[in-house]
């Protein structure tokens, strides 16, 4: 009886939390989520510490992989048959939806990590049945193993699909490294349900369609871009055009690229909605174990071929959906269209009158023809005046369309790979493209010590040198490998005028450093970083530590012509916890904004901690404020920030919005002021544990060494030329 009463209880004596149960973030949701700084480490990676994918992929037989992929396109499998005997449309959709999750605001998303294999992306409604595409690729992934990442394979499959249907692509680069668990740093929205409409209580809209919450680039939870049926599922091509324009712009695409990508994506393949959408099983993450990671099982019919239900819309856009041609524009512009509903009940458009020979054939029986269809987004290309202008030009000049689409598609699938120096493989194009943020090769043959000596004698202060170097490097984003010190774009528009860069101070410092660079043959980019290093060495020496900050010459200087000002505006800092600065008050807490920047810089929580403590005592605060400068020895690289932060002789009192006073408990005397960013290193239990390490009497030297190592990591974050 007792055994029966205990049946169903956790059989593991220690009660480890392997599934259900509240996490710390559930109990205390306002706590800092430091987990975003510690993802994708060796504990989750099955590859050995010595494994370097970017070296391994160069051993790949590139031609053999493409040959195998080309053969796969027409090797239809009974368990998931190819439409018209060709998997091209499916593979393109898979690659598109991987790359298309990128957003320019924070560089996150995109196809560069193989994240489509994991939640939530693998289970988004917009990615229905892409699980089948990846399973079709498994034999190729299995064959080439460690030399070919899922991330590269998913994107390459889309590229080869186009080529197999007659399109000449612009090129392809390998080098995307796989992750091994879902990303924790990417914000996909706050809605609690898939496809929640814009009047949802947790809506990503606060007003008109341009009020889409930053940094999001999709109109609904679970979509890549827009709702194909119309805004909130209500057909209206002109309103949908607004959504298309906003979402594609947030992926750094202009109107011409948007029309080209829409047309190129819909020239081939079809939508699937020939059935009852209510009879589709759960997505992969919700499916039972016997489904083996697959989802969306059709519970009402055989669910493949002509009976497939995916988006709910049904039909092909063109007459020949497995052939690259200019049929999309002829179909769209040469016909009048009327609203109808698919068998699954989705809104779509069909031609009012069409010749039978212009109708696409059935995916299984070529003797049967079906009506073509257009989504509301396709109709936006016809109805919106700006979009139609490009559509008509493309219709009249197919070669021009091919060129624009080839470049836009290449941009789409490489946007998150960073500069051209990261490209690998025989098909990587040589041309410099402005969206790659090109940087000329730098000089390594100058006398580094001579440059450092001139900087030391220049009269620049420690804070001026360190702050300028930091500002130059802090723009780096590990999400899409943009920004950083290489190129010295801090001296160019728009960065030279950013409030966070203190333009007046910056102009003064650059005036000195540019002269030194010209005299010595060093690049301005190298000279800026060297100045920061000189400042740190001086501050360390003043504190009794004789150190040399590591330095690798070779940074180049970009020109204004190499710089897309509009695109770089997205890199402007709105805050910088490292320099204790907020452009204005935001709904997001300052410490959360610091955490976001830290993650983009690729830093760990201990590295963030030691950098904050060092930057404070070096006097690098924006505008020279004294918040968080817990020392009487400003300009010396000491651990005073941590010593005084953890000293119980002091009490911390709020005196305003994001402002605190540090008072002597006995006398009541105010010793220092602080912000939330400062105090979080004493209040958060994890960060306090790091702060205590650096406050210890025996860790003064460790503090200096760790600060220098973290500093060097930031300065070299964009040095993809270094081993």
Curated annotation (Swiss-Prot):
- Here the cross-link named Tryptophyl-tyrosyl-methioninium (Tyr-Met) (with W-96) sits at 225-251
Gene3D superfamilies this protein is in? 1.10.520.10, Peroxidase, domain 2 (1.10.420.10)
Give the EC class as a word: oxidoreductase
The UniProt keywords, alphabetically, are:
Heme, Hydrogen peroxide, Iron, Metal-binding, Oxidoreductase, Peroxidase
Annotated cofactor note: Binds 1 heme b (iron(II)-protoporphyrin IX) group per dimer.
SUPFAM superfamilies in the record = Heme-dependent peroxidases
Q: One biological process GO term for this chain?
A: cellular response to hydrogen peroxide
Pinpoint the Tryptophyl-tyrosyl-methioninium (Trp-Tyr) (with M-251) cross-link: 96-225
Its EC number is: 1.11.1.21
Catalytic activity of the protein: H2O2 + AH2 = A + 2 H2O; 2 H2O2 = O2 + 2 H2O
Q: Which residues bind heme b?
A: 266
Marked site, Transition state stabilizer, at 93
Entry's Gene Ontology molecular function annotations: catalase activity; heme binding; metal ion binding
What does the entry report about post-translational modification of this chain?
A: Formation of the three residue Trp-Tyr-Met cross-link is important for the catalase, but not the peroxidase activity of the enzyme.
Question: Which coenzymes or cofactors are required?
Answer: heme b
Q: Name one GO cellular component term.
A: cytosol
Active site (UniProt):
97 (proton acceptor)
Q: Which family does this protein fall into?
A: Belongs to the peroxidase family. Peroxidase/catalase subfamily.
Can you state the subunit structure given in the record? Answer: Homodimer or homotetramer.
Describe its function: Bifunctional enzyme with both catalase and broad-spectrum peroxidase activity.
Which HAMAP family does UniProt cross-reference here? Catal_peroxid
What is the recorded name of this protein?
Answer: Catalase-peroxidase
Record the organism. Answer: Alkalilimnicola ehrlichii (strain ATCC BAA-1101 / DSM 17681 / MLHE-1)
Protein encoded by which gene: katG
């Amino acid at each position: 009886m007792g055994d029966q009463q205990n049946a169903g209880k956790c059989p593991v004596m220690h009660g480890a939390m392997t599934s259900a149960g509240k996490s710390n973030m559930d109990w205390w949701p306002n706590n800092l989520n430091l987990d975003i700084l510690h993802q994708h480490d060796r504990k989750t990676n099955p590859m050995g510490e010595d494994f370097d994918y970017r070296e391994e992929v160069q051993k790949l037989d590139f031609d053999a992989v493409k040959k195998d992929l080309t053969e796969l396109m027409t090797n239809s499998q009974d368990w998931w048959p190819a439409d018209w005997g060709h998997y091209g449309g499916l593979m393109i959709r898979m690659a598109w939806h991987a790359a298309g999750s990128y957003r320019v605001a924070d560089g996150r998303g995109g196809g560069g990590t193989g994240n489509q294999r994991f939640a939530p992306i693998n289970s988004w409604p917009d990615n229905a049945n892409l699980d089948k595409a990846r399973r079709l690729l498994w034999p190729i992934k299995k064959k080439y193993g460690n030399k070919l990442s899922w991330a590269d394979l998913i994107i390459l499959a889309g590229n080869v699909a186009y080529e197999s249907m007659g399109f000449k692509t612009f090129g392809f680069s390998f080098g995307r490294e796989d992750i091994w668990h879902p990303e924790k740093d990417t914000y996909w929205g706050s809605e609690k349900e898939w496809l929640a409409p814009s009047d949802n209580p947790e809506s990503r809209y606060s007003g008109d369609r341009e009020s889409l919450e930053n940094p999001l680039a999709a109109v609904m939870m679970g979509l890549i871009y827009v709702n194909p049926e119309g805004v909130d599922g209500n057909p209206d091509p002109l309103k949908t055009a607004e959504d298309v324009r906003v979402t594609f712009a947030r992926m750094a695409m202009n109107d011409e690229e948007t029309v080209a990508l829409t047309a190129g994506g819909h020239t081939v393949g079809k939508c699937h909605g020939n059935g009852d959408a209510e009879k589709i099983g759960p997505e992969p993450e919700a499916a039972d174990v016997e489904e083996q990671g697959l989802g969306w099982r059709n519970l009402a019919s055989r669910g493949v071929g002509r009976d497939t239900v995916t988006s709910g819309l049904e039909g092909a856009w063109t007459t020949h959906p497995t052939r690259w041609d200019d049929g999309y524009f002829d179909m769209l512009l040469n016909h009048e269209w009327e609203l109808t509903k698919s068998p699954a009940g989705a809104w779509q458009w069909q031609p009012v009158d069409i010749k039978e020979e212009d109708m696409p054939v059935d995916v299984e029986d070529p003797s049967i023809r079906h009506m073509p269809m257009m989504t509301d987004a396709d109709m936006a290309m016809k109805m919106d005046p700006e979009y139609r202008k490009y559509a008509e030009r493309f219709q009249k000049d197919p070669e021009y369309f091919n060129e624009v689409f080839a470049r836009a598609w290449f941009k789409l699938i490489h946007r998150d790979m960073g500069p051209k120096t990261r490209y690998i493989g025989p098909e990587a194009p040589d041309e410099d493209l402005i969206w790659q943020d090109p940087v000329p090769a730098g000089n390594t043959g100058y006398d580094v010590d001579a440059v450092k000596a001139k900087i030391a004698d220049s009269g620049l202060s420690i804070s001026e040198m360190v702050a300028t170097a930091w500002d130059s490097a802090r723009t780096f984003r590990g999400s899409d490998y943009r920004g950083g010190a290489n190129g010295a774009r801090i001296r160019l528009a728009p960065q030279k005028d950013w409030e966070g860069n203190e333009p007046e101070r910056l102009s003064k410092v650059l005036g000195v450093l540019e002269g030194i660079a010209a005299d010595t043959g060093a690049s301005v980019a190298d000279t800026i970083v060297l100045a920061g290093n000189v400042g740190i060495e001086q501050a360390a020496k003043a504190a009794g530590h004789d150190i040399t900050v590591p330095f690798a010459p070779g940074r180049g200087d970009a020109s204004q012509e190499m710089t897309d000002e509009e695109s770089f505006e997205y890199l402007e800092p709105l805050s910088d916890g490292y320099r204790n600065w907020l452009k204005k008050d935001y709904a997001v807490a300052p410490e959360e904004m610091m955490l976001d920047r830290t993650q983009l810089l690729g830093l760990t929580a201990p590295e963030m901690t030691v950098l904050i403590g060092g930057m404070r005592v070096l006097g690098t605060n924006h505008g020279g404020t004294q918040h968080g400068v817990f020392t009487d020895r400003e300009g010396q690289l000491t651990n005073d920030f941590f010593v005084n932060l953890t000293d119980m002789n002091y009490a911390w009192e709020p005196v305003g919005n994001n402002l605190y006073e540090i008072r002597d408990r006995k006398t009541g005397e105010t010793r220092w002021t602080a912000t939330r960013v400062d105090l979080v290193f004493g209040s958060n239990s994890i960060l306090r544990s790091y702060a205590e390490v650096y406050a210890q009497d025996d860790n003064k030297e460790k503090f200096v060494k760790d600060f220098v190592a973290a500093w060097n990591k930031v300065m070299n974050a964009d040095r993809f030329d270094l081993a």
